[in-house]
Amino acid sequence: MLGTFSINDKLGKRLVAILKGFPCSWGRCNFCPFAIEQSFNTRDVIFTNRRIINEALKTLEKEDHKRIAVFNGSSFHELPYDTIEKLRELAKRHIFEIESRSEYINISSIEALLSYYEPEKLIIRIGFEVYDEKIRENLLNKGMPNTELQRIYRLKNEVKELGLPIEFWVYVLFGIEYIPEEKVIESIKVFKKMFDGIIAIKYKKYLPSHPKEVPISEYLAKFLEENTDLVDWGGEQWIIERRD
């Protein structure tokens, strides 16, 4: 999955850069496959990401993209400084999307990102996955209780009052055994009132220890398409591969 690609979907034309990351500091979500592509080797992470960022910059020279999305399978703030610095040229004057766990996000950290990258807009994606706290904490083991959910909601409102060009988007997970369809629907209805955008993610099982995939109804598929900003059904570009 590492690399760059252009995509044109409900969010418009985007340039996506999927970077190599260090293992997530939390690392206990029981469905997450991203450790497969991560590394403890700092040199490996730095030089892999230099190559990917250079590819992205070359693409920008040939094609116009207003929206740049950067993913690294953990939190943006866990990337090495070399990578953080080299992303400035990609981010400046673009709509810049990153992913993060909630604990890294506060008014100081996001103001620092705005100052450093000077994006047209900063979009922060957070994987709360489901509104139901018992499912999120006891079954998915996310480590993001409702206190964090409410804190990020208050932060979103504070950012709006300050007039900062920042949006908070959340992921909702579906097609996984622990989250019944009615809880997926509940999550979307609640999160639509709380945050700026929702992306629904179809779960894919990668490891034997991971929860099972479950089929979804036509009703849920239609509901997702009509009530979220994007449904990520998966695709070849998102396949995670072990790279030793």
Residue ranges of model-derived segments:
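Distinct, well-ordered alpha-helical segments
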Residues: 79-88, 106-116, 181-184
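Short acidic/His/Gly/Ser-rich catalytic and metal-binding motifs that mark active-site loops
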Residues: 26-29, 132-135, 207-209
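Acidic (Asp/Glu)-rich catalytic clusters
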Residues: 59-62, 87-91, 111-121, 157-163, ...
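Conserved C-terminal portion of the radical SAM core fold
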Residues: 147-210, 223-237
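Class I (Rossmann-like) S-adenosyl-L-methionine-dependent methyltransferase catalytic domain
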Residues: 243-244
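Alpha-helix N-cap and loop-to-helix initiation/capping positions
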Residues: 43-48, 140-148, 179-186, 212-219
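Core AdoMet radical
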Residues: 34-79, 91-106, 120-149, 169, ...
